[in-house]
């Protein structure tokens, strides 16, 4: 399946199409959207975002705790879309 992923960045909103087997960070990069990242392995917080609506599968990540996930935080480098989804990017500072 292919879903619409909308990124709300400091520069504005941008939307990409993302297959359900592609990480949302990779889909953003392919579309020329510059998002923060570091490890690309789901084990740090550089790429953290927050899901505003919709759902992702981020079972590959190993950094966020259950409370952070419940609040909507997402590691874009290790998240697959499971529906149309809207994600606020550049949220690493809010994870403290």
Curated annotation (Swiss-Prot):
[2Fe-2S] cluster binds at residues 39, 44, 47, 77. This is Ferredoxin. Pfam families: Fer2. InterPro entries: 2Fe-2S_ferredoxin-like_sf, 2Fe-2S_ferredoxin-type, 2Fe2S_fd_BS, Beta-grasp_dom_sf, Fd_pln. Its cofactor is [2Fe-2S] cluster. It comes from Brassica napus (Rape). Binds 1 [2Fe-2S] cluster. NCBIfam families: fdx_plant (TIGR02008). Gene3D superfamilies: 3.10.20.30. Ferredoxins are iron-sulfur proteins that transfer electrons in a wide variety of metabolic reactions.
């Amino acid at each position: 399946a292919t879903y619409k992923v909308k990124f709300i960045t400091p520069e504005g909103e941008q939307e990409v199409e993302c297959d359900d087997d592609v990480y949302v960070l990779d889909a953003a990069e392919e579309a020329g959207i510059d998002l923060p990242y570091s490890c690309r392995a789901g084990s740090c917080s550089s790429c953290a975002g927050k899901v505003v609506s919709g759902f992702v599968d981020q079972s590959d990540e190993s950094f966020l705790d259950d409370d952070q996930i419940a609040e909507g935080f997402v590691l874009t480098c290790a998240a697959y879309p499971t529906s149309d989804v809207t994600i606020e990017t550049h949220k690493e500072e809010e994870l403290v």
